From Swiss-Prot:
Keywords: ATP-binding, Magnesium, Nucleotide-binding, Transferase, tRNA processing
Residue numbers marked as site, Interaction with substrate tRNA: 106, 127
GO biological process per UniProt: tRNA modification
Enzymatic reactions: adenosine(37) in tRNA + dimethylallyl diphosphate = N(6)-dimethylallyladenosine(37) in tRNA + diphosphate
Protein task: Catalyzes the transfer of a dimethylallyl group onto the adenine at position 37 in tRNAs that read codons beginning with uridine, leading to the formation of N6-(dimethylallyl)adenosine (i(6)A).
Residues that coordinate or bind ATP: 15-22
Enzymatic class: transferase
Cross-referenced Pfam families: IPPT (PF01715)
A GO molecular-function annotation: tRNA dimethylallyltransferase activity
EC number, UniProt record: 2.5.1.75
Gene that produces this protein: miaA
Species of the source: Streptomyces coelicolor (strain ATCC BAA-471 / A3(2) / M145)
Name of the featured protein: tRNA dimethylallyltransferase
Taxonomic classification: Bacteria, Bacillati, Actinomycetota, Actinomycetes, Kitasatosporales
Interaction with substrate tRNA: region residues: 40-43
Cofactor(s) listed in the protein's UniProt record: Mg(2+)
Length: 312
């Protein structure tokens, strides 16, 4: 007599860029009768396809993917708005008896979707003052200030990401506490299995370099040109995306396209280290090797994690 299949719950496939999260998410959705919910902040933008490594319709293997292509490039990303949209979709899938497969490397977005997080409000006066300072002094100066006020937040936020630096400093001023202190403990609102895809750094760096080369060959520069005509340069969030920021700089004559490509590789490697550090701090993540030697075993091991009771 066979046992009943496990009741649907939320699966979060996390880890650094280029680790193989998207393919694993599709596999799990196909095997479990689930649907993918995007947790990559830059894949939320319409038209940002090549540079974000967004799966093509063919690569999605017939699996519905939610929260892709929902914002214009001029829209400023909001994790609070993402939280609302993601939970709406997760709740609907669970009500239908389907497995929500959250896939992405944006750590705060993943936590916003599955954890008991409430995001502090904004103060227009503080925000305006910090944005003026950002314009005058640049993100590096504000990042240095953040490193003093909240070293953990500074480690998690790229020094070039002025928008996120401003937000962290704003929250610190509003609450009188470090930005990271406003993130509560690991208190999930859903029964969630978190699977981290782990790739050794040398191999991951090779994958990143190869991925950037393929993006250039696939037409990233033309994609950025087209999006620039739609307001990409004015978009506070989208214009900072890896690859897009570097190509925009080249199109503005600030560097060559070859230099932009090399800087995209360097910046992506730095970003991958930050992603890895973020997810390593969460004890609920069950890490599985996504290295080339273990790639064939990864789907089976992930499925076995999901199909048995998981604590933590």
């Amino acid at each position: 007599m066979s046992s009943a299949p496990p009741a649907p719950r939320v699966i979060a496939v996390v880890g650094p860029t280029a680790a193989g999260k998207s393919d694993l998410g599709v596999f799990l959705a196909q095997r479990l009768g689930g649907e993918v919910v995007n947790a990559d902040s830059m894949q939320l933008y319409r038209g940002m396809d090549i540079g974000t490594a967004k799966l093509t319709p063919e690569e999605r293997g017939g699996v519905p993917h939610h929260l892709l292509d929902i914002w214009d490039v001029t829209v400023t990303a909001s994790v609070a708005e993402y939280q609302r949209l993601a939970r709406e979709r997760i709740d609907a899938l669970l009500a239908e008896g389907r497995w929500p497969i959250l896939v992405g490397g944006s750590g705060l977005y993943v936590r916003g979707a599955v954890d008991n997080l409430e995001f502090p409000g904004t103060d227009p006066g503080i925000r305006a003052r910090l944005e003026e300072e950002l314009e005058l002094r640049g993100p590096g100066a504000l990042h240095a200030r953040l490193a003093v006020a909240d070293p953990e937040a500074a480690r998690a936020i790229l020094p070039s990401n002025g928008r996120r630096i401003v937000r962290a400093l704003e929250v610190i001023e509003i609450t009188g506490r470090p930005f990271t202190a406003n993130l509560p403990g690991h208190d999930s609102v859903y029964d969630t299995v978190q699977i981290g895809v782990d790739v050794a750094r040398p191999e991951l760096h090779e994958r990143i370099a190869l991925r950037v080369d393929r993006m250039w060959e696939a037409g990233l520069v033309d994609e950025v040109r087209a999006l620039e005509a739609q307001g990409l340069r004015e978009g506070r969030t989208a214009s900072r995306a890896l690859g897009y920021q570097q190509v925009l700089a080249a199109l503005a004559g600030e560097c060559t396209l070859d230099e932009a490509r090399a800087e995209t590789v360097r910046a992506t490697k730095r970003f991958a280290r930050r992603q890895d550090s973020w997810f390593r701090r969460d004890p609920r993540v069950h890490w599985l090797s996504g290295g080339v030697a273990d790639r064939t075993e990864l789907p089976r091991l992930a499925l076995s994690l999901v199909e048995r009771p998981v604590t933590a």
